[in-house]
Amino acid sequence: MHWVDATVKNQQGPQIVSTGISPSGPIHLGNLREIITGDLLFRGCRDKGLESELIYLADDMDPLRKKYPFLSDEYEAHVGKPLRHIPSPDGNGLYSDYFLNPFIKSASELGIFPRIIKAGDLYRDGKMGEVIRIAIQNRDKIRTLIETISGRELEKEWFPYNPICSSCGRINSTTGYELNGDLVSYKCECGHEGKSNIFKEEGKLPWRIEWPAKWKVLGVTIEPFGKDHGTVGGSYDTGKAIAENIYGYPAPLPLMFERILLKGKGAMHSSTGNVIPASEILSFCPPEIVRFLMSRVPSTRHIEFDPGMGFLSLMDEYQRIVKDHKPEDSRIIELSSPFGSDEREVIDYRHIATLVQIYDDPTKILKIIKSTGVETSLEDISKIMTLAKHWIVNYAPETFKFSILPKTQVVKITDEEKIVVSDFIHWAQLPDSQWEATSIHNAIHIIIKEHGIEPANGFRIFYSILIGKERGPRLGFFLSAMDKKTLLERFKFVVSSS
């Protein structure tokens, strides 16, 4: 049983799966794990026959915590203000939407279509008013729960509601101290004193209270979350206690997920710039592979993502399990598909990444791919060509990149190597020789073996003639993709001129 189905097997009745983020910076591959995990759980419930909904909560009432390296100096003046009250870095709209909207687009490309809920809208529309009132009325009980479970002591003046200062606009510099009717009296570090209406967009609950309050308001039944929230005494533990003891609401089924690390760079953080934005990964990685990255392993296992050659290995792994289609892999394939279909035909990305360095003609590449027995379309080939080109320029190691040498460029090879190349030319001109990858590979292997040459050294002869390197793409596929007449002319020139 796939880990998704095992997680939701005991769920009954309608389900609301909740995920979310604070849109304070570029929303990246690491953040994608949350929404993809949420979507996997949503699909697990739906496939179980349960009425289900996926919601995505944008915490746009969170304050800007500091001026991040990717922001201009003018944002120093906005530190402490709610993200939805800050101008966008491009000067067009809101700060929170600037980072949220591209992510929503990326999610749709991944086949994820949650109901988007903005925290600020919940406060603006008065939906948080009663849970705020309950929190303030139970201030002492909540303090005891948080201090007992988390093991940390709250400040003496701690108050379970953070008003927005009507003078300076900050939410992290105020202290509420009294609720009269619907109004919370507060003082701000800027010197201003005022009143905040709990039924308006004039403040917010602290995170450890806001999370369980939203469970109740939104009817959440399942929620995946990062390991930082799932530590002993962490925000899930306090949230569960507050939900059950203060709000009388059962805590949702939890599922902790591990981080995604960038190979050699560690965990991704928007604040440090160590990220691959969601939109960027989809510029070189097919959507089903992003989903496969998450669905193939339990959520509790950390993932190390290598955008270089490791990415090609991931592509190869997906291609292999789709081709083999073992019963135990069918659910992974299904959950990896953006739109839930069982897509059996997979185009060899590694092969395309080689071909686009030889040809820039999708029609030519389509013909080559079809010759390998894969049925696909010009549209699909063009899409993968675009992805592969982006990967080559931005992530491929130099060892993978190449360019074809001019037909008349001199390359020095030994007399023994000339004989090897001449033998290959002879084989290629035989009436019964087949100009396809496997036959070419086998022919070269036989020829170099007859001359007592190690395979790596034998292959190096052909790579040096064609691309001036000691290593290159899979040789059989590489040669079969090239024009036979042009290729043999190149080999004959080198044999005769060196």
Where does each model-flagged region fall?
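Basic, alpha-helical terminal appendages of large translation-related enzymes
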Residues: 1-12, 27, 53-55, 143, ...
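A glycine-rich helix N-cap at a beta->alpha junction
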Residues: 75-110
